[in-house]
């Protein structure tokens, strides 16, 4: 209440909170023992869990991932597909469809994140360089049709030829645009933002960093209202960097990812 945690008793019926108040007669009581009860987490950028790689995950594998995530408080996730062959990406999408359409016990798969293939080779990270492309909006349309509208997020490098022209079309397809894996200048990144990009993908990793004479894509992310993906594992970004991001962007613009 008003940004503060309260000591309350919650009445839950069929998995939904009915009200906060006195315990009804005959109700089962679960004592949280002082722990905080919060809404389920949403992991917007994840590539797998418990030994399962999203790029090779069957619907059954995705249930393994979803069960693990739910056990640790994550109730929804987007599956992030690394740049792969068209054949393998299509296979992944079909398996995602199968998982989403079947009864499941674990976290809900709320969308697909295409991390590529429109990424800069110089900042490719783990992406296979020979599969990277400049632009191909028809390919994205094909994937989105196959996914039945399930592609919710894509990461692009703004400096690649033709990528800026793709952004409005991607928005029309219902896809959130993130910028990353990029050596974009400040001006290129700001143009991408003006055209509709709304997320900085794992900011500070696989990205051209700030210089006082060229703030680059990093500076554009920090200055703008973009959401700032932040890998909070203590390795990709040290704790001091995460604290700096939080102060620069404000907590409402930080997206903690795994």
Model-predicted regions and their roles:
Residues 41, 48-57, 78-88, 206-223:
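Active-site loop-to-helix "anion-binding N-cap" substructures in soluble metabolic enzymes
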Residues 58-61, 92-95, 136-138, 212-218:
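Charged helix-capping and loop-helix junction motifs
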